[in-house]
Amino acid sequence: LRERGVAVPEIFFSDPATGVMLQQDLGDLSLNQALKENPDKVDLLYQDAILHMFNWQRLADDGQCPAFRLSFDVEKLMFEFDFFIDHTLRGYYKTTAPDAELKEIRRAFLKIAEKLAAPANKIFTHRDYHSRNIMLVGSEPFDSAQGPPPHYRQFIIDFQDARLGLMQYDLCSLLCDAYAPLSLERRAGLLDFAFEQGKEIHRQTRAEFDHYWQLSAFQRTVKAMGTFGRQAALG
């Protein structure tokens, strides 16, 4: 990814046999922290993150990246929906709903999964692109009074689960982030920005863009609820 222009940490040394790796230190300033410290720069920071997202969404398969062998297909999407049913509904909430009702929920999930998996124009997705996985690095301090310095850069981490999917998936991860809630008005403005700036990538009408945004946001949120439900149930 780094060789193809995506801002990821540089790896200086790795030894797969021992599991040892030495990589670039990105510091401790995440986008999540920067948003809290700079409430007047929220739109600017998110717009930069959206433009950064386009860098990997433009990537073409060069035969080297394993992410292009994986996809958000029906099987993967249903695994995440089933994870929610098993670990949040059954595990955390201890639902007493009859199996027939849970099967009806699963049938509804399957329809959504089939719609999300149907489009052929899938692209490289980070899969967990939220404010805690974006680091701000620069040669100058990030001054809350001045906003981001001119020589800072956003780096991404935690991209090991990357796979092919719709461009809306990473956008949902970013704008429907439980760690950094946005107002509906601000989210709508950032969606407008993403639609206009990303036309060459998504190649959708606004109605199509919004349709897949809504489906992706629902699926991504249910997936997150499954993860948090499992964590809470385990204590």
Residue ranges and their predicted role:
Residues 105-109:
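Short amphipathic alpha-helical coiled-coil/interface segments
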Residues 17, 25, 47, 75-82, ...:
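Alpha-helix N-cap/helix-start motif at coil-to-helix transitions, marked by capping-box chemistry
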Residues 90-103:
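Conserved P-loop NTPase mechanochemical-coupling segment
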Residues 21, 56, 110-171, 181-182:
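Active-site acidic catalytic loop and adjacent metal/ATP-binding pocket
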Residues 82-92, 164-203, 218-234:
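Active-site activation/catalytic loop segments of kinase-like enzymes and analogous catalytic loops
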Residues 63, 71-78, 125, 131, ...:
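Glycan-recognition and catalytic cores of secretory/periplasmic carbohydrate-active enzymes
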Residues 69-75, 205-217:
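All-alpha amphipathic helical-bundle segments outside canonical DNA-binding/catalytic cores
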Residues 1-79, 83, 90-93, 118:
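ATP-binding pocket architecture of kinase catalytic cores
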